[in-house]
UniProtKB/Swiss-Prot annotation:
Lineage: Bacteria, Bacillati, Mycoplasmatota, Mollicutes, Mycoplasmataceae
Gene expressing this chain: munIM
Transmembrane segments: none
Repressor found in the keyword field: no
PROSITE patterns: MT_A70 (PS51143), N6_MTASE (PS00092)
Entry keyword set: DNA-binding, Methyltransferase, Restriction system, S-adenosyl-L-methionine, Transferase
UniProt-recorded name of the protein: Type II methyltransferase M.MunI
Similarity annotation: Belongs to the MT-A70-like family.
Catalytic activity of the protein: a 2'-deoxyadenosine in DNA + S-adenosyl-L-methionine = an N(6)-methyl-2'-deoxyadenosine in DNA + S-adenosyl-L-homocysteine + H(+)
Amino acid sequence: MENKVTAYSIYNKKAKKNTKVNPLDEVFPQLPRKKYQVIYADPPWDYGGKMQYDKSTIKSENEGFKRDIFISSASFKYPTLKLKELQQLDVPSITADDCILFMWTTGPQMANSILLGESWGFEYKTVAFVWDKMVHNPGRYTLSQTEFVLVFKKGKIPTPRGARNVRQLLQIHRGQHSEKPYAVIDGITKMFPALDKIELFARNNFVGWDNWGLEIPDNKIEIPTQGEIDENK
């Protein structure tokens, strides 16, 4: 009997080749020896190698399928981490007595995100930002179109504060995989312009911020100006 080719058999073959691996001996690089009042984090959540579908590449392997298969996973783009691994990160060592944490999450990782924030010594407060990506992905229940930035607090809200009119809803077209809109870090900067701030799992090197991660550019740049509403929608 001829073996049936399935989407998962294609994925499993690609996964071993494409999965990104942390190049460090330790799970994490060394954190700064400094206390921060503002922390902005985009944890590299592990989704168990979840496949994504799209009418796109690997056309030679799409024969016999009703729709084209696009083999992709977060783990193909960067090293991902499970909740227990993220909880090992010694964030408490860099938090001031009064500190606020802004953390990116998705619907499936909402509960884990709250557990992670609590394990780092914070109390969950609310949703700071809702990002409408202006395009939907397949979802198990409804079509997925949003990501969220949760806000956690340790002690009191740090002072001095800046802007009090930063909008929660951002309607901005998504960019590259896992790329987040600049409007979020710009908004946080406006809310807390004078405080010590650090971006965890950073891929940028912005003026006014310290950063930590595996993919940080050498040169500092200004935060690009980006409106809360995408004019190209």
